[in-house]
């Protein structure tokens, strides 16, 4: 969940030019133009905003924010009225990349918000909260995806029904291919269902978004594992292509000796699965979690909510986690708080978990010990762990590898009834060993094609355990590769900036204002009727930075924040209610208006108002659309660069003529 607690209260001022240091005189002189000799005239350059460049799913974030704020309008019908509400239009733009916005709007750590240029003004745009709102709107209004007009007759097997598998199934179905998902669980969802607690991803929300994908005609075979229940050879015979979205639902044991066959030392994945299956309803009085990422936070907060039962036996929770039994639901009326400690080799401020989740965990009474590592397990005569011995350490990443240095003499024992290892995940390759690259993962190229296996693609945690949004992005890119393979088309090179972006040509066609034949090499001209006047799309190779914007245009505007139910040590016990409420219509529009539309015109009129030669003018309404709002009369333009200086979004660049 992205719910940053920090607020920028200092109002800032901005300058385009800084005091000139000697080494910068030449560069600054280059920006001083005179009417008699300047040859630099404005061109309109579409760039990718850093929010989209930071989004692993590749969402057109700027696009749906511009729709929500009213800059980009839905298409109109013959009666002159919009064919759909702005909420639906924004949702459809969002779901071109991500079919699970209601889920991701709740649990995604939102790297897009970290990259947001608005951070240089006062605070990031609440992108995650807008996504949450649109996902909720779609469920409430039963919005469905549009089925393809025709089918290709090609069949694709998707192994695994987690975020990667659902993403590729969705994208392939839209392309007209028949998809069958094989999953060895009772329900689809992968880690969204069996890893993340239900109070973070409500099951009715998850079910609704999964069902919408299945409504495209996707077939499902549950409790069926390829490699054991059905052979890979049979899959290859029955299907034209295969996607491996196996996930990484196995846990990694503690990296200390003596943990084998110790019943009260478990992995995070088995702990969370037992909880999400409904088998685990209480734990021991003292729980120690070893980790530092978001999964370890989930384990710790679940343990805090479950609490312990004084009359229970250790075998009760151990058997539930092992899948051997389910605890008696009647016992939960007697639950008491559990003491939960979470250890991490990194200091708390450098932990991999998102800061808001760390803050919530600490508020709920979880003791987070940063800079500690496990060194030994203390066991009794029955081979049960009674404590975890830890010592202080210094950890850092060197060349992509974790290096940990123990601090001698700092050891201490943490008494524990249950120890949970949340230090990583592993992949079960049973029956599919041929795909194991020897490092417990699958090797692919940049299009996620499995090396040496034509027609086989992979994505998600089988490549590298990462975020849910990363798995969704893998699925979308793999779907493009599978589609090209099935159609016999040679796979093209993926763009440098591989995300969904605003498509001006599509928007012109949508409005019915396409001028002649579209020809990319001519897009920068002002004479050809087959091109858009002085426009260049560099979205596939360029992310625009904050120092290319006119930040002084943007007034200090606090972020519209979602309401979060904050729990303490007492109120967390037994509380499994969702704690995050979506924004309402007014709030979400207000939040979208904070977007600076980096790299694309948002129709502020600054360039028209401030041009001293009236060279910049508005395009006729019958020919204009988003991204084609203004143009330049080069017979009047003197190259003074004022239009560029006052362009808030960095859409205008003084490059034409160079």
Regions found by a protein language model. Give the residues of each.
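Ferredoxin-type iron-sulfur electron-transfer modules and their immediate structural context
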Residues: 1-155, 203, 242-261, 269, ...
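Beta1-alpha1 glycine-rich phosphate/pyrophosphate-binding loop at the start
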Residues: 27, 59-82, 91-93, 120, ...
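Short gly/ser/thr-rich secondary-structure transition/capping motifs
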Residues: 136-143, 223-226, 267-274, 398-406, ...
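Rossmann-like dinucleotide/flavin-binding elements
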Residues: 158-182, 222-231, 250, 270-355, ...
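Short, well-ordered alpha-helix to beta-strand connector turns
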Residues: 217, 239, 262, 284-285, ...
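A conserved short coil-to-beta-strand element within the FAD-binding core of flavoproteins
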Residues: 222-236, 371-383, 394-395
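Glycine/threonine-rich flexible loop motifs
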Residues: 253-257, 399-406, 430-435
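Active-site rim loops that border cofactor/substrate pockets in soluble metabolic enzymes
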Residues: 386-403
């Amino acid at each position: 969940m992205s719910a940053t607690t920090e607020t920028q209260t200092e109002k800032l001022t901005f300058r385009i030019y800084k005091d000139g240091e000697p080494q910068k005189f030449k560069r600054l002189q280059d920006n001083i133009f005179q009417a008699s000799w300047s040859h630099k005239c404005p061109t309109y350059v579409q760039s990718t905003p850093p929010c989209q460049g930071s989004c692993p799913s590749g969402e057109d974030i700027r696009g749906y924010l511009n729709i929500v704020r009213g800059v980009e309008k839905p298409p109109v019908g013959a009666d002159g009225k919009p064919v759909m509400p702005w909420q639906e239009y924004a949702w459809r733009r969002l779901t071109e990349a991500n079919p699970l916005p209601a889920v991701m709007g709740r649990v995604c750590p939102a790297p897009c918000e970290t990259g947001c240029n608005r951070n240089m003004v006062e605070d990031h745009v609440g992108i995650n909260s807008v996504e949450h709102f649109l996902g909720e709107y779609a469920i409430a209004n039963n919005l469905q995806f549009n089925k393809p007009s025709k089918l290709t007759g090609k069949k694709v097997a998707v192994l695994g029904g987690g975020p990667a598998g659902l993403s590729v199934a969705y994208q392939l179905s839209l392309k007209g291919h028949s998809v069958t998902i094989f999953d060895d669980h009772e329900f689809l969802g992968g880690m969204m269902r069996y890893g993340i607690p239900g109070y973070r991803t409500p099951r009715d929300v998850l079910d609704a978004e999964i069902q919408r994908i299945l409504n495209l005609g996707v077939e499902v075979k549950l409790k069926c594992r390829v490699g054991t229940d059905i052979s890979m050879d049979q899959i290859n015979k029955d299907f034209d292509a295969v996607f491996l979205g196996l996930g990484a639902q196995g846990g990694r044991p503690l990296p200390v000796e003596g943990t084998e066959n110790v019943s009260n030392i478990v992995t995070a994945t088995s702990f969370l699965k037992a909880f999400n299956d409904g088998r685990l309803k209480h734990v021991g009085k003292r729980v120690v979690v070893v980790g530092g990422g978001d999964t370890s936070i989930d384990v710790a907060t679940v343990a805090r909510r479950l609490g312990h039962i004084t009359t229970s036996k250790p075998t009760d929770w151990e058997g539930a986690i092992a899948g051997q039994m389910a605890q008696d639901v009647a016992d939960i009326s007697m639950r008491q708080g559990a003491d939960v400690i979470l250890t991490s080799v990194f200091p708390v401020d450098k932990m991999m978990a998102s800061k808001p989740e760390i803050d919530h965990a600490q508020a709920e009474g979880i003791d987070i010990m940063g800079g500690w590592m496990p060194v030994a397990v203390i066991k009794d005569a029955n081979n049960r762990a009674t404590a975890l011995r830890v010592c202080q350490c210094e950890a850092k990443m060197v060349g992509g590898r974790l290096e940990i240095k123990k601090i001698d003499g700092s050891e201490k024992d943490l008494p524990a009834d249950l120890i949970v290892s949340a230090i990583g995940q592993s992949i079960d390759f049973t029956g599919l060993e041929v795909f194991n690259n020897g490092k417990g993962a699958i090797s692919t190229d940049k299009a996620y094609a499995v090396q040496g296996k034509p027609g086989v693609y992979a994505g998600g945690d089988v490549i590298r355990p990462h975020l849910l949004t990363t798995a969704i992005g893998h699925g979308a890119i793999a779907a493009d590769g599978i589609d090209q393979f099935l159609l016999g088309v040679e796979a093209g090179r993926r763009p440098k900036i591989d995300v969904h972006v605003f498509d001006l040509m599509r928007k012109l066609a949508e409005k019915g204002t396409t001028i002649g034949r579209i020809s990319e090499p001519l897009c920068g001209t002002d004479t050809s009727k087959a091109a858009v006047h002085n426009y260049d799309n560099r979205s596939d190779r360029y992310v625009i930075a904050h120092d290319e914007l006119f930040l002084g245009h943007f007034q200090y505007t606090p972020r519209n924040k979602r309401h979060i139910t904050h729990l303490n040590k007492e109120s967390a016990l037994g509380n499994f209610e969702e704690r995050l409420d979506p924004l309402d219509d007014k709030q979400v529009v207000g939040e979208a208006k904070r977007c600076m539309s980096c790299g694309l015109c948002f129709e502020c009129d600054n360039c028209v108002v401030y041009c001293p030669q009236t060279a910049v003018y508005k395009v006729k309404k019958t020919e204009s659309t988003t991204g084609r709002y203004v143009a330049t009369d080069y017979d009047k333009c003197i190259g003074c660069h004022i239009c560029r200086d006052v362009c808030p979004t960095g859409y205008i660049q003084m490059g034409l003529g160079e």
